Amino acid sequence: MGYQNVSFPENSKFLVTGGAGFIGSNLCEAILKLGYKVRCLDDLSTGKQANVDMLIDNPNYEFIKGDIKDLDTCMKACDGVDYVLNQAAWGSVPRSIEMPLFYCANNIMGTLNMMEAARQSGVKKFVY
């Protein structure tokens, strides 16, 4: 499978959940470089404030500190967004085995909240 160049309509707005983490912050930066608007949602539990700080002065970047386990936060984050790139999750298979309820609440129910908020908000595409 080869690389395919994808373009989006002008003034498209992206939401990157987990946007203060390694992958999420790099996605935010790449999307901004393409000239699109980016909203980042992260609770900073594993993401880094420094990743937010390096982008915060860009007028096309918005940061929301919030938790995907809260549906109201997800609804606010999805408002006016065209595309959601869901990177918010707790990693580590060993820890997920040690703390399954915690991981289920965040990774499964949090993603479900994001999907429902995206559906209700009319988001065009949801990538997870």
Roles of regions detected by a PLM:
Residues 1-128:
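N-terminal Rossmann-like NAD(P)+-binding domain of SDR-like oxidoreductases, especially those catalyzing
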